Amino acid sequence: MSTYAIIKTGGKQVKVEVGQAIYVEKIIPEA
């Protein structure tokens, strides 16, 4: 059994595991 997280960013969901690096789009906050 592996430990993982599901991250929602930029309208996408990404599954990441321990020690894994991901790249996400830069999110510009709305003023």
Swiss-Prot record:
Entry superkingdom: Bacteria
Keyword annotations: Ribonucleoprotein, Ribosomal protein, RNA-binding, rRNA-binding
Stored InterPro entries: bL21-like, bL21-like_sf
CC per GO annotation: cytoplasm; ribonucleoprotein complex; ribosome
Keyword Ribonucleoprotein recorded: yes
Any single Pfam family the record assigns to this protein: Ribosomal_L21p
Molecular function terms, GO-annotated: rRNA binding
Subunit comment: Part of the 50S ribosomal subunit. Contacts protein L20.
Family from the record: Belongs to the bacterial ribosomal protein bL21 family.
Function summary: This protein binds to 23S rRNA in the presence of protein L20.
Protein name listed in UniProt: Large ribosomal subunit protein bL21
UniProt organism field: Streptococcus thermophilus
Gene: rplU
